[in-house]
């Protein structure tokens, strides 16, 4: 019985570690990827910018679908898109309004960011 409990705890911890480390590589390939606010609580960071669940699990949101279609890279086309239909391009929302950001560089803007996968005016939290 104790062995089963230990195994369950180990599996739960392993799963949590995997989730915590699942998407940093994607955060690094979009401007301000590790600073995108959670639209339901802007004092928190959305860990999985491309997912319905802000922790990075579950189905992809519209930005995640567009990011996947772009080869999981920041491209000018992806930057110019308005994935969530809120009237602001993904680049504007992520601090790259001119679509010139490259991985490893500091984006043109690092504050006043918004989530490119959810229209903050209509998101249901």
UniProtKB/Swiss-Prot annotation:
InterPro entries: Temptin-like
Entry keywords, A to Z: Disulfide bond, Pheromone, Secreted, Signal
Compositional bias per record (Polar residues), positions renumbered to this chain: 103-113
Disulphide bridges: 40-125, 79-99
One Pfam family of this chain: Temptin_C
Domain of life where this protein originates: Eukaryota
Tissue and organ distribution: Produced by the albumen gland of the egg cordons.
UniProt region (Disordered), positions on chain: 78-125
A cellular-component GO term for this protein: extracellular region
Locations listed in the record: Secreted
Signal peptide bounds: 1-22
GO molecular function: pheromone activity
Function: A component of the complex of water-borne protein pheromones that stimulates attraction and mating behavior. Modulates pheromone signaling by direct binding to attractin.
Subunit text: Binds to attractin and enticin.
Protein name: Temptin
Organism: Aplysia californica
């Amino acid at each position: 019985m104790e062995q089963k409990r230990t195994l369950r705890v180990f599996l739960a911890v392993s799963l949590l570690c995997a989730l915590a480390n699942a998407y940093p590589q994607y955060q690094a390939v979009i401007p301000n990827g590790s600073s995108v606010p959670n639209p339901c609580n802007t004092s928190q960071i959305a860990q999985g910018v491309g997912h319905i669940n802000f922790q990075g699990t579950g189905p992809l949101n519209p930005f995640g679908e567009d990011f996947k279609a772009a080869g999981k890279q920041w491209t000018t086309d992806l930057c110019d898109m308005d994935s969530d239909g809120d009237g602001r391009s993904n680049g504007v929302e992520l601090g790259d309004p001119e679509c010139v950001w490259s991985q490893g560089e500091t984006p043109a803007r690092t504050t006043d960011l918004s989530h490119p996968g959810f229209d903050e005016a209509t998101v249901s939290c």
